[in-house]
Amino acid sequence: MASGSVQSSSGNGRRQAAVVDEFTVPGDKRSLLEKSRPRIQALFPVLFTVLGSLETFQQSEVKEDEEKPGRIWLQLKGEKQAVRRAKEYVKGICEPELEEKQSYPKEMHCIFAGAQSSFLNHLIQDTCADVALSDIGVLGIKGATEPVVMAQSRVQQFIALFKDNLSLPSHKEPAVKKKFKLYVEKHVDKYTVDLLLLPSALKSELLSLACDNQLSCEDLSRQSSDDKAECKVNQKDEVSRKGAGTPVTELTSQLDSVFSSAAEDSPCLIECPYSEQDRLSVKRRSSEAEERFSKKPFSLEAVQVDGPVNRNADKNNVPIIDLISEPSDFEDSVIVVEADDCVSSETEYKILVNFFKTMGYSQIVVEKVIDDLGQSEEPLKLLEEIEKQSKKELSVPFSQSSSYSTDLLKARGTSSLPKCKIAIAETVQSAAPSKVQPKALLATDKAGPSNPFCYKSQTKATVVNPIPTDQTTIVAPAERAFNNHFDPPLTGVQIFQNSLKVQYRLELKNEPGRWDLKHIIIDGSNVAMSHGLQRFFSCRGIALAVEYFWKKGHRNITVFVPQWRTKRDPFITEQHFLQQLQELGILSFTPSRTVLGARIASHDDRFLLHLAERTGGIIITNDNFREFVVESPSWREIIKERLLQYTFAGDIFMLPDDPLGRYGPKLDDFLSKQPNNRTVHSSFPSSNERFVPRDQFAPPRNMAPKTGLNQPMAPRAGHNQPMAPRAGHNQPMAPRTGLSQHRFLQLIKPQEPFTPALHNIARPCPIMPPERSPSETMQLKEALLKIFPEADQRHKINEILTAHPFMRDLNALSAMVLD
């Protein structure tokens, strides 16, 4: 090993010692080192040279025992600290003492792959270990023992900060976010948005890692100072700024003075840190939805970059990030517009609408005002008009109801006010008269319900116009005057997000279940979307469904969810329930993958039907599976008989007591492998049904028999006469078949009530209906064959029609075929 030093002068005028260090590594690493030379020189400010193998020197110097054969000489030249760290890194990749695999959440992939891999490079510079991405979610770390342990500890620290989702103190957080944002935008790539959504504590740690390199910190500070200088130049050059600005950028400057006290609640617009010339042609809008909803993940699939993103010295070629996200109330987290002539009116319109929406105004009102006044109108005028329209919309119900009640009073011919509390959406102009006594107000409280025109609301009334003194007046205290400020209307999304604040833990007791229960197969996507109001994929809904069946004794429970639902997405809530259920072996992910930005996913409903066919289980879903009815007879039978629908009442999972209808089996029998035959009823009358609905018994009108009140109707000859019900009871006993009670009562004439005075009088019995004609039988057969087209069902249909010559009810015949 050889080393030496020469004097070199640095850029700041001080002379620093340039160290030359030579050492050997195994000769088989020569090709690896040749390929890695540019990367090593980029990571460490050194000059790296591969000198050659020892055999070359042995031939000239004839010293065979100086070094072992098969090794090569390397030379590093640079500052002492840089040479030492580069040497440790090179020896680590050539002769590693330790190799480790460190896993991390896939949502953190942006840290190691994003910002043009700058954070990964700084981690290597800081620890001198070779850190590389083995796969998404896995890091490969190798090198000397101490560097590997340091790198692994640093990565684990990042993971802990990410999982804890910690925030910095309020006085430090804005500065860290701004500094991190400048750094990330300097190294822009397709992971930029995901990096901006990281917790602020993790951002601070990444900045400290990056700023260990003095050059990075100097660049950031220089860029920040350039920003300030550009701001001053732009303030002086107001004419040029207005020429290149848009109504959205003008809106920011005008609203700074109006909403200075609510800077955190209103979104702001930030200009990109470029040169003055670029600043006039490039505008950037950053929605603070990413800060207000920092806990919500962002889907990596929503970011697409047109072409590769490289570090460009030419500032004219500014990379543009297009964000394609699902429609939501907080769209377009980042929008970069290149050049003023490229801004379309549609983009301008969308930016304006989204800006006012984030301030809490209704989208309908915002679009109406912009359409009326035009999107080129002064932003403050747009804001004032939007506020006026919002107030009008909220005041319309009050004015309409007030005029309606006044018209009703005039129609009744009374001049007195109704003695109830009336809320009037106007401000009190004068103080309450001193003649009104408190007792008068108490008296009207009781008189309210007697008046049909009183409002149900107990809001205090306010009187605007003077009222004659001879009438009873109701005046609210002056301090309870109606407030002109209107809060934005409550939405279902807000209710759902508030419900998530209530903590819920999935706890399944470790106790034996019931062996006689069927396998439960849950359509995870259907359940999650149902609990999330069809807007959010609520993993809590899946957990609630699993907990419900677990408490009922089911232990064979399977939930199917597509694999892509594991990605971070603001519309997927409480994803930790998916991980918990997967660890318990209850959750199964259906395959999905992404190829060139396009998602390829298998149909998860097919997995539900396949498993139900193999296990005889019940599918929990609100889907009808119409597209699978014709797939196979077994699937059709599953769809008809083994789908269990559900509903959510908040966080309460509810199932119907009669899953197959009013006359079907009860829920417990439906879920049991061996249901109780005494309690199971078919949805239709059974095959041995002897009672037919009344309209099937009735003969033609011209053949109706004329009998007296107490005269029994003559039975048709040649047929057994049904036994008459016994008199002396208030109502007949219901038959044991699935026929409902009201059908059975139709067999008795409604004109003949059961009274104690008629105990011994025989009741009239219905006559038997005539047999079907051949044409009727043929029509029924054709109808049944349309319902059951299978060849094996034709013989059964013929047998049923032959065995029941009086039956004309298509539903009853269909039930017999199913039985």
From Swiss-Prot:
Q: Name one GO cellular component term.
A: nucleolus
Give start and end of each RNase NYN domain: 517-669
The record's keywords, sorted A to Z, are: Cytoplasm, Hydrolase, Immunity, Innate immunity, Nuclease, Nucleus, RNA-binding
Region (CoCUN) residue spans: 772-819
Judged by the first EC level, this protein's enzyme class is hydrolase
The EC number(s) attached to this protein equal: 3.1.-.-
- What CDD domains does the annotation carry? KH-I_N4BP1, KH-I_N4BP1_like_rpt1, PIN_N4BP1-like
Q: Where is this region: Disordered?
A: 1-20, 226-247, 666-736
Biological processes, Gene Ontology terms: innate immune response; negative regulation of cytokine production; negative regulation of proteasomal ubiquitin-dependent protein catabolic process; negative regulation of protein ubiquitination; negative regulation of viral genome replication; regulation of innate immune response
Protein's job: Potent suppressor of cytokine production that acts as a regulator of innate immune signaling and inflammation. Acts as a key negative regulator of select cytokine and chemokine responses elicited by TRIF-independent Toll-like receptors (TLRs), thereby limiting inflammatory cytokine responses to minor insults. Has ribonuclease activity.
Q: What is this protein called?
A: NEDD4-binding protein 1
| Species this chain originates from | Xenopus tropicalis (Western clawed frog)
Organism phylogeny: Eukaryota, Metazoa, Chordata, Craniata, Vertebrata
Q: What gene does the UniProt entry assign to this protein?
A: n4bp1
